Amino acid sequence: MPYPDREQVRLDFNAAKKALRAAGVPPKLIISIETKALRTGRKLTGEHVTNRQSRWTISPTNPQYASECDARVIFIILCGMMFEFDNAPALPQEAKSLFESYLGKSIEPGTYRDALLLEKLDYYRLRDDALNPQHGYSIYHIGHQDPTRARRHVPNNVAWRTSRSNLIQGNMTLREARIYLIKLIGRYFELGELDIK
């Protein structure tokens, strides 16, 4: 999907943050989403050491790299997806139109599901997690359809996922993880470990 140029994305990024505040989204949650979208994770060992740097300031060979424009688009997309969670606050039409233009579809409250486990995600849980964080843990993560993709932090490869879903997927593509789960369930039945009677 084509997105606006960098200057327009910056304007829309600021408009999105203003819309979030107007919808009653707590500042700590806005900062949390901004950190996930714009900054690298903490990786203090190994080949690609990072610690919350702006994604566009690190080497493009780093798996956590994203252009500034892509990182800001991802922020807008993640926020738009959040308004499809159960219990998400209502959005005024003007703000809704902004988020929908980046999502490429209409926002339908209460319809968002984790792409692997198909569990519904809940705004209150996301909000509470941001307001009362536990070091090293968050209930919802940014997931990647293909975590092995050379440039993985791009708008069409990013979505909200549960922490468990991210753990199960690991370094598999979403499709590979789904097939793996089906095979796993099949083995349980084959070995008599499950019976649905």
Task: Kindly give the residue locations of the regions a language model identified.
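Sequence-level detector for tyrosine residue identity
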Residues: Y3, Y65, Y102, Y112, ...
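Catalytic cores of phosphodiester-bond-cleaving enzymes
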Residues: K36, R42-L44, H48-Q53, Y102-I107, ...
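Short, charged surface segments at domain edges that flank catalytic/cofactor-binding sites
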Residues: S59-L121
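Polybasic, low-complexity binding patches
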Residues: T148-A159, S163-K197
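Short, well-structured alpha-helical interface segments that form or flank functional binding sites
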Residues: E94-S97, P109-Y112, Y137-Y140, H153-W160, ...
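Mixed-charge, low-complexity interaction segments
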Residues: M1-M82
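Histidine-centered nuclease catalytic patch
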Residues: A115-W160
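Generic structural signal for bulky hydrophobic/aromatic residues embedded
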Residues: I33, L117, R164-S165
